[in-house]
Amino acid sequence: MSSSASLSSSASLQRVVVLVGPTATGKSVLAVRLAQRFNAEVVNADSMQVYRGMDIGTAKLPPAERDGVAHHVLDVWPVTKTASVAEYQHLARAAIEEIGRRGRLPILVGGSGLYVRAAVDRLEFPGTDPAIRARLEAELAAHGPEALHARLARLDPQAAERILPTNGRRIVRALEVLQLGRPRFAAELPEYASVYDALFLGLDLATPELDDRVERRVAAMWQAGFVDEVRHLAEDCGLREGRTASRALGYRQVLTMLDGGCDEAEARRRTVDATKRFVRRQRSWFRPDPRIHWLDAADAALETAAARTIEGWMTSRS
C-alpha cells in the first residue's frame, strides 16, 4: 500500500494505530518508519517525554532522527508540573483528531499503559479532594512511597500490582480515590473498549535480550551526557520541585547522586535495575489486552511485518 492510501471508510470512527510495548524495544524508530509508509504522524504516549528538557533519559528521538515526521504531545510541560492523566488525555485526543481531519493517520506510540488507555479508551477520571490529597502527600513525604504502597496493597491489591512501589504520585492518587468512596482504583479501569477504530501493535522480545538492551541503553545515556542533563534541569529548571519528573527513571537516581546519596556507579546501577523492574510492570500491563497484535522486536523483518498488519487492517475497512 502506498503512502497516499486513502483513510476514508464507511465507519464513522477515527482510525488510529497504537504501538506499545516495554522500554527499549524500538517503538520510536519503528513509528517513524511506519509513518513514512502510511502518510502518518506520531502522537506521544510516554508519560515522561511530555516534559521539556527530559531528552536523553527518556530516549526521546532528536528532531534530526524523526526524518520529517511530525510528532505531537512532546515537550509540552515544564519539569515542575505535576502530571495529569486527564490533561494528557485532552491533549492526545485533540492531536489524534486534528491529524485525522487533515486526512492523515495518527500513530500513538508509548510504553506508559495508563496514558495509552487514556488516549484511546473509554476512560473517565474521578474527582479530587484537596484536603485528602494534601494529607496523603504529607504522609508520602514523612514515610516514603513504599509505606503507602503497602497500605494500598491491603486495600486494593489489583491497583498495587499495577503501580510501582516507588511511584508516590500514583499511589497517592489511588488512595485518594479510595478515600473518596469511589470503587476500587483498579476496578475503575473499564473493559478494553476504544473510542476510535484502533489497531494495536505490541513489540517485545526475550527477557535476556531485553535486559541486555536496557543495560546498553543506560550506558548510552551516560555516554550522551545524561548526568549533565539532570544537573541542568535541577539547577536551572526546578527539577527537584517537580513531583512527577523528579521521580522519573534515571532522573531520580541521578538526583540522589547529585545530592550525595550515592556515587555515580551506584546511580547507574540503580537506573539499570529500576528500568528492568519497570519493563516487568509494562508487560503485566499490556499482556492482558486481547487487542494487541504482538511482534518480535528482534525480527529483522519487523517493519515489513508491522506494515503488512496495518495494510490488512486498512484494507478490511475500505
From Swiss-Prot:
The record marks 112, 133 as: Interaction with substrate tRNA. Pfam families: IPPT. Substrate binds at residues 23-28. One of its GO terms (molecular function) is ATP binding. Keywords: ATP-binding, Magnesium, Nucleotide-binding, Transferase, tRNA processing. Its EC number is 2.5.1.75. It catalyses: adenosine(37) in tRNA + dimethylallyl diphosphate = N(6)-dimethylallyladenosine(37) in tRNA + diphosphate. SUPFAM superfamilies: P-loop containing nucleoside triphosphate hydrolases. Its cofactor is Mg(2+). Residues 46-49 are annotated as: Interaction with substrate tRNA. GO terms for biological process: tRNA modification. ATP binds at residues 21-28. The keyword Membrane does not apply. Catalyzes the transfer of a dimethylallyl group onto the adenine at position 37 in tRNAs that read codons beginning with uridine, leading to the formation of N6-(dimethylallyl)adenosine (i(6)A). Monomer. Belongs to the IPP transferase family. This is tRNA dimethylallyltransferase.
